[in-house]
């Protein structure tokens, strides 16, 4: 992810509120890492900082994070548009010719990316992800990501909002796969 300066007042509170909303909406699809966002339930050392943490933090389960961003695109924009212009494909998925920038795709597509420590993440094919983490896990994360995107996009559409694309991060807590990080 490329870092941007924070010029949005209360950005942390807004992102936390949005993530809590989406976690609730999609909880029947996949469990998540949230323990609580109520600072009164945080461990004592953290409660001393309640004023700074309230509304802008979450206490979460520790996980082993899968080292890929699970990107779902419903529209052809951003880096997907750039790839399509060059190759007619996005992350190895060939798309119909003649699509226009930001056009709705016939079906949402799963386009994973590596998690870069600095700079922008690198788009990869599903096959490249499968080589790194296994075909079974890749298939499961693809199914979960597409299901979450569809549910969120359908809900947002009822509110006049279009979700062009989004990314999800997943982790392992024991044998369980859970959704981690901020959502949508």
How would you label these PLM feature ranges?
Residues 1-165, 171-184:
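Acidic/polar, glycine-anchored loop/turn motif associated with catalytic or activation segments
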């Amino acid at each position: 992810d490329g870092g941007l300066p924070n010029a949005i007042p209360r950005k942390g509170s807004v992102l936390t509120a949005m993530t809590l909303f989406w976690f609730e909406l999609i909880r029947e699809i996949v469990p998540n890492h949230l323990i609580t966002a109520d600072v009164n339930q945080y461990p004592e050392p953290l409660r001393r900082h309640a004023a700074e943490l309230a509304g802008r933090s979450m206490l979460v389960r520790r996980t082993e994070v899968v080292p890929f961003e699970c990107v779902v695109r419903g529209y052809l924009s951003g880096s997907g548009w750039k790839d399509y212009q060059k190759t007619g494909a996005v992350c190895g998925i060939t798309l119909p010719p003649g699509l226009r920038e930001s056009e709705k795709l016939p079906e949402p597509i799963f386009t994973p990316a590596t998690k870069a420590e600095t700079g922008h993440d690198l788009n990869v094919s599903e096959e490249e992800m499968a080589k790194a983490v296994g075909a079974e896990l890749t298939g499961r994360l693809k199914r979960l990501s597409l299901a979450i995107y569809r549910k969120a996009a359908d809900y947002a559409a009822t509110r006049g909002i279009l979700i062009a694309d989004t990314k999800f991060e997943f982790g392992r807590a024991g044998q369980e796969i859970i959704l981690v990080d901020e959502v949508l």
